[in-house]
Amino acid sequence: MHFIGVLNKDGGTFRTMDMAAFATSAERVFAEHGNSLECRVVAGADLAAELERAASDPSSDALLAGGGDGTISAAAGICFSHRMALAVLPAGTMNLFARSLGVPLQLDAAVA
């Protein structure tokens, strides 16, 4: 399965991380599980447009959204309109959406 990951570098946890290293690590973990992941790291101001591009990409089977509740909410709406599966990567302050779904709040565990 091919995922496109849109990672909001302005989201809580991501603000303090080396995003290039994280994206490379996440792509490697997906490959180890027989999937592919293409990470796109974006600023919050560019998030909606990139989510829309990713959901419209014919090579994508699912969208991985990384960020806080605002990022995940925007991604959910776009995925719904495109009838696309959404994977959640909690990287905000509260991560209420991820908590309600039982997604692990530690990034490494959520990626795995």
Across the structure, where does each feature detected by a protein language model lie?
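ATP/NTP phosphate-donor binding region
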Residues: M1-L63, S73, G77, D108-V111
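Glycine-rich beta-strand-to-loop/alpha-helix junction loops that act as flexible
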Residues: K9, G66-G68, L89-A91
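Residue-level detector of secondary-structure boundary/capping sites
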Residues: M17, V88, G102-L105
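Short beta->alpha junction loops/turns
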Residues: A43-G44, G68-D69, V103
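Short gly/ser-rich anion-binding loops that grip negatively charged ligand groups
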Residues: D61, A65, A87, S100
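Short glycine/serine/threonine-rich phosphate/pyrophosphate-binding segments
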Residues: G70-A75, L96
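A short helix->loop->beta-strand "cap" motif at the edges of active sites that frequently abuts
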Residues: H82-A85
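Short, glycine-/small-residue-rich phosphate/pyrophosphate-handling segment
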Residues: T93-A112
